[in-house]
Curated annotation (Swiss-Prot):
Thermal dependence summary for this entry: Thermostable.
Amino-acid positions noted as binding Zn(2+) 1 in the UniProt annotation, renumbered to this chain: C38, H61, C148
Binding sites annotated in the UniProt record for NAD(+): G172, I173, G174, G175, L176, G177, D195, K200, V260, G261, L262, R331
Superkingdom: Bacteria
Organism: Geobacillus stearothermophilus
Name of protein: Alcohol dehydrogenase
Length: 339
């Protein structure tokens, strides 16, 4: 089968023929139709996170396609089902985290396109219990980004605890942030969009943001305090330490700051202010299978629509180069042509 393979960190991926995976008990073989491209894939290809991915590696954790083979013990899926393979490739299923609905915190999880091969290939082996079905009225290209960008921002908004009518700030209106604005509006929240690009703020307005602010032109936290008394919650998708600091300062008493982006720096927290003002600081990573089902349903109902750019798998190195330069609008989705 054709695949894009990381053979050495920080080297271009190689488009090559590799062995088609075989499946065993509890697994399915998925014929990949499309796979979204995420910044995490770039980190995997560069090997620049503390825990390195396996090598060689087929990246991709937004792979979607059709079940082509069903292994022994699989009863809830059949050949022809439309499914996606998320970042949470599998978890142990019996630890405290798994049993309490926090499977994304399982210490024995496997991750698609990182610890196991992912969706940058014509076929992908998957743990049947962890693939998620795609609603019939959602195309593969539309569905792919929901498996990471969608569910990640949807879950982040859920954990803010913000209620309909309250204010939430979305920091960074990129691949995740532009989806977050739409989920927030669909959930009945008022939205302040924050970005250093005016074109991104115009997009946020088109997507329903109630207020926008460019922190290069004015103090974003001060703007929010003056306009709405501070936001009830902030979700930071930007990979930027200043964005995290501004988000913290934008929150009213009793509010929540949810961290999603992964900048390399440390972030100092003023303990006195945090305690005195009852500020909650929450880390949020992707979402559970249930979160993903809910996120997909929003998209299927037309309430959330990812801005996508479709490219063939062979263009992956060009896509990575553009991603490094910040030249991607929305999300890139790779497609794989049928043989």
């Amino acid at each position: 089968m054709k695949a894009a393979v990381v053979e050495q960190f920080k080297e271009p991926l190689k488009i090559k023929e590799v062995e088609k995976p075989t499946i065993s008990y509890g697994e399915v073989l998925v014929r990949i139709k499309a796979c979204g491209v995420c910044h995490t894939d770039l980190h995997a290809a560069h090997g620049d996170w503390p825990v390195k991915p396996k090598l060689p590696l087929i990246p991709g954790h937004e792979g979607v396609g059709i079940v082509e083979e069903v292994g022994p013990g699989v009863t809830h899926l059949k050949v022809g089902d439309r499914v996606g393979i998320p970042w949470l490739y599998s978890a142990c299923g019996h630890c405290d985290y798994c049993l309490s609905g926090q499977e994304t915190l399982c210490e024995h999880q496997k991750n698609a396109g990182y610890s196991v091969d992912g969706g940058y290939a014509e076929y992908c082996r998957a743990a049947a219990d962890y693939v998620v079905k795609i609603p019939d009225n959602l195309s593969f290209e539309e569905a792919a980004p929901i498996f990471c960008a969608g569910v990640t921002t949807y879950k982040a908004l859920k954990v803010t605890g913000a209620k309909p009518g309250e204010w939430v700030a979305i920091y960074g209106i990129g691949g995740l942030g532009h989806v977050a604005v739409q989920y927030a509006k669909a959930m009945g929240l008022n939205v302040v969009a924050v970005d250093i690009g005016d074109e991104k703020l115009e997009l946020a307005k088109e997507l329903g943001a109630d207020l926008v602010v460019n922190p290069l032109k004015e103090d974003a936290a001060k703007f929010m305090k003056e306009k709405v008394g501070g936001v009830h919650a902030a979700v930071v998708t930007a990979v930027s330490k200043p964005a995290f600091q501004s988000a913290y300062n934008s929150i009213r008493r009793g509010g929540a700051c949810v961290l999603v982006g992964l900048p390399p720096e440390e972030m100092p927290i003023p303990i006195f202010d945090t305690v005195l003002n009852g500020i909650k600081i929450i880390g949020s990573i992707v979402g559970t299978r249930k979160d993903l089902q809910e996120a997909l349903q929003f998209a299927a109902e037309g309430k959330v629509k990812t801005i996508i750019e479709v490219q063939p798998l062979e263009k992956i190195n060009e896509v990575f180069d553009r991603m490094l330069k910040g030249q991607i609008n929305g999300r890139v989705v790779l497609t794989l042509e049928d043989k």
